[in-house]
């Protein structure tokens, strides 16, 4: 009896481990996000268990939102692969995502826009 717990659980089958992501019903890894939150805070501070679940849920929701809009953009252009251009069109086309994501997307191109003052009136012709 060197281990101390030899006869305690001998008859019971061990329960299968359930990850925190599965408990929360998420696809994003709650454990990994919790680890990164702990190491990235000042002086390796304390992070509550629910903070990682909440952060994972937010990241999963935002990712699903961007991918849905980018998928719609690629479908409109009749292609089956999402490119950085489709991500750019999706993010800049949505007002809330545009204000949230200020990053430059490599290979995203530019958003077509002509200022109203530059558009001439119908019937008005420039004479040279």
Curated annotation (Swiss-Prot):
<protein>
    <recommendedName>
        <fullName>Histone H2A.V</fullName>
    </recommendedName>
</protein>
<dbReference type="InterPro" id="IPR032454">
    <property type="entry name" value="Histone_H2A_C"/>
</dbReference>
<dbReference type="InterPro" id="IPR002119">
    <property type="entry name" value="Histone_H2A"/>
</dbReference>
<keyword id="KW-0539">Nucleus</keyword>
<dbReference type="GO" id="GO:0060090">
    <property type="term" value="F:molecular adaptor activity"/>
</dbReference>
<dbReference type="GO" id="GO:0006325">
    <property type="term" value="P:chromatin organization"/>
</dbReference>
<dbReference type="GO" id="GO:0003677">
    <property type="term" value="F:DNA binding"/>
</dbReference>
<dbReference type="InterPro" id="IPR032458">
    <property type="entry name" value="Histone_H2A_CS"/>
</dbReference>
<keyword id="KW-0832">Ubl conjugation</keyword>
<keyword id="KW-0007">Acetylation</keyword>
<feature type="modified residue" description="N6-acetyllysine">
    <location>
        <position position="12"/>
    </location>
</feature>
<dbReference type="GO" id="GO:0000786">
    <property type="term" value="C:nucleosome"/>
</dbReference>
<dbReference type="GO" id="GO:0046982">
    <property type="term" value="F:protein heterodimerization activity"/>
</dbReference>
<dbReference type="Pfam" id="PF16211">
    <property type="entry name" value="Histone_H2A_C"/>
</dbReference>
<feature type="modified residue" description="N6-lactoyllysine; alternate">
    <location>
        <position position="14"/>
    </location>
</feature>
<keyword id="KW-0158">Chromosome</keyword>
<comment type="similarity">
    <text>Belongs to the histone H2A family.</text>
</comment>
<comment type="subunit">
    <text>The nucleosome is a histone octamer containing two molecules each of H2A, H2B, H3 and H4 assembled in one H3-H4 heterotetramer and two H2A-H2B heterodimers. The octamer wraps approximately 147 bp of DNA. H2A or its variant H2AZ2 forms a heterodimer with H2B.</text>
</comment>
<keyword id="KW-0238">DNA-binding</keyword>
<feature type="compositionally biased region" description="Basic and acidic residues">
    <location>
        <begin position="1"/>
        <end position="12"/>
    </location>
</feature>
<comment type="function">
    <text>Variant histone H2A which replaces conventional H2A in a subset of nucleosomes. Nucleosomes wrap and compact DNA into chromatin, limiting DNA accessibility to the cellular machineries which require DNA as a template. Histones thereby play a central role in transcription regulation, DNA repair, DNA replication and chromosomal stability. DNA accessibility is regulated via a complex set of post-translational modifications of histones, also called histone code, and nucleosome remodeling. May be involved in the formation of constitutive heterochromatin.</text>
</comment>
<dbReference type="GO" id="GO:0031507">
    <property type="term" value="P:heterochromatin formation"/>
</dbReference>
<dbReference type="GO" id="GO:0070062">
    <property type="term" value="C:extracellular exosome"/>
</dbReference>
<feature type="modified residue" description="N6-acetyllysine">
    <location>
        <position position="5"/>
    </location>
</feature>
<feature type="modified residue" description="N6-lactoyllysine; alternate">
    <location>
        <position position="12"/>
    </location>
</feature>
<dbReference type="GO" id="GO:0005634">
    <property type="term" value="C:nucleus"/>
</dbReference>
<dbReference type="Pfam" id="PF00125">
    <property type="entry name" value="Histone"/>
</dbReference>
<keyword id="KW-0544">Nucleosome core</keyword>
<dbReference type="GO" id="GO:0030527">
    <property type="term" value="F:structural constituent of chromatin"/>
</dbReference>
<feature type="region of interest" description="Disordered">
    <location>
        <begin position="1"/>
        <end position="23"/>
    </location>
</feature>
<dbReference type="InterPro" id="IPR009072">
    <property type="entry name" value="Histone-fold"/>
</dbReference>
<feature type="modified residue" description="N6-lactoyllysine">
    <location>
        <position position="116"/>
    </location>
</feature>
<dbReference type="InterPro" id="IPR007125">
    <property type="entry name" value="Histone_H2A/H2B/H3"/>
</dbReference>
<feature type="modified residue" description="N6-acetyllysine">
    <location>
        <position position="8"/>
    </location>
</feature>
């Amino acid at each position: 009896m060197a281990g101390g717990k030899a006869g305690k659980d001998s008859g019971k089958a061990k329960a299968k481990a359930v990850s925190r992501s599965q408990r929360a019903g998420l696809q994003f890894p709650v454990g990994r996000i919790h680890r990164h939150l702990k190491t990235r805070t000042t002086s390796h501070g304390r992070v509550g268990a629910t903070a990682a679940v909440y952060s994972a849920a937010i990241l999963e929701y935002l990712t699903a939102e961007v991918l849905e809009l980018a998928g719609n953009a690629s479908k409109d252009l009749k292609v089956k692969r999402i490119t950085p251009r489709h991500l750019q069109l999706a993010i800049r086309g949505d007002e809330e995502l545009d204000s949230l994501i200020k990053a430059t997307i490599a290979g995203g191109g530019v958003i077509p826009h002509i200022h109203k003052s530059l558009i001439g009136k119908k019937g008005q012709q420039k004479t040279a």
